[in-house]
A protein has these predicted regions:
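Conserved lysine of the Walker
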Residues: 12
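Post-Walker A alpha-helix
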Residues: 15-16
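Glycine-rich, often acidic-flanked micro-motifs
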Residues: 2-6, 20-142
């Protein structure tokens, strides 16, 4: 699974739909996903709310990458280092669900996840060119 992360209105649902159309991807949630780490690795989970997309499937899939989205006129992608990745991810976590005093546990989980899951920054256009740019970077075929 590829998880798109961004503030509301940036284009998560748009990029997910483009991947569905151009790469045959299955979208398990159009807004937010849960993430777990277990003996089998890092997994993304559909959640029972979907934002504006209406897509929320009760599915889990191995997480292969997280992509922080930004809007741009030209497509640019780069892999984020650990500190950059944690900062970007923390901006998009539902902090309301983290109990007081548990923030360090959340950061520790992110650090563990980053050992196997790369995080990218994709500043992109809302069209097929963005899909191609990301697919090329992730080495995903047609």
């Amino acid at each position: 699974a590829i998880l798109f992360s961004a503030p509301c209105g940036t284009g998560k649902s748009t990029q997910a739909e483009l991947w569905r159309i151009h790469k045959g991807a299955e979208v398990i949630n159009g807004d937010k996903a849960g993430i777990s780490i277990d003996a089998d690795g890092v997994n993304a989970h559909g959640l029972p709310f979907s934002g504006t997309s209406g897509i929320c499937k009760n599915r889990s899939m191995p997480l292969s990458a997280i992509v922080i989205l930004g809007q741009a006129k030209e497509n640019r992608i780069r892999r984020l280092n650990g500190a950059e990745a944690i900062m970007c991810l923390m901006e998009n976590i539902y902090l309301d669900f983290i109990a007081p005093g548990e923030m360090q546990s959340c950061v520790d989980l992110l650090i563990e996840m980053l050992k196997t899951v790369p995080v990218y920054r994709l500043d992109c256009t809302p069209d097929e060119r963005a899909v191609k740019k990301l697919a090329d970077e992730l080495k995903i075929g047609n």
